[in-house]
């Protein structure tokens, strides 16, 4: 999805993503797009690379637009997984990981990044890695990860 940010476009973001102000000028604004993506967040596990950052941006966007989203969303972060499961990699960037696993990636393009994260998760599951230590919950009211309780 492309979204009209309703703000000035920073050259840094265009250089990073290749997305220009012209490309999003006729795109829906976030509140309109939320009608489509909100139900997706209600449907299962969210998987992203550096997920806490992406979720915090989404949470602040919801707050700034005055959109109430009551959910605590289960998520898994492929960056956190790879740090622990593949420590031999030179870094834990998504493009490095995709190259290592021979996955196609058009970096910083949301659809491609999302597909890659799904493929990474499937790869880790196929190798028998235990993913339960990486399952987290994000609270969109507090805009933060819910810390697991520790029983003593």
Report residues per predicted region.
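Conserved beta-strand -> loop -> alpha-helix junction used to position metal-binding or nucleic-acid-contacting
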Residues: 70-82
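Acidic, divalent-metal-coordinating active-site segment for phosphoryl/phosphodiester hydrolysis
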Residues: 110-123
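Acidic two-metal-ion nuclease catalytic site recognized across multiple nuclease folds
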Residues: 120-152
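Generic alpha-helical structural context detector
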Residues: 80-83, 99, 119-122
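A short, structure-level motif marking secondary-structure boundaries and short turns
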Residues: 43-44, 78-81, 124
């Amino acid at each position: 999805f492309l979204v009209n940010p309703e703000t000035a476009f920073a050259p840094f973001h265009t250089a990073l993503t290749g997305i220009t102000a012209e490309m999003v000028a006729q795109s829906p604004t976030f509140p309109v797009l939320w009608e489509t993506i909100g139900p997706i967040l209600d449907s299962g596990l969210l998987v992203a690379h550096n997920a806490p950052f992406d979720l915090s941006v989404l949470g602040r966007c919801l707050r700034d637009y005055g959109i109430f989203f009551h959910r605590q969303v289960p998520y898994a972060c492929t960056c956190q997984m790879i740090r622990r499961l593949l420590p031999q990699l030179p870094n834990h960037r998504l493009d490095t990981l995709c190259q290592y696993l021979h996955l196609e990636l058009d970096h910083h393009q949301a659809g491609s990044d999302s597909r890659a994260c799904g493929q990474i998760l499937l790869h880790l599951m196929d190798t028998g890695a235990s993913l339960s230590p990486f399952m987290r919950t994000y609270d969109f009211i507090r805009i933060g990860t819910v810390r697991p309780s520790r029983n003593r």
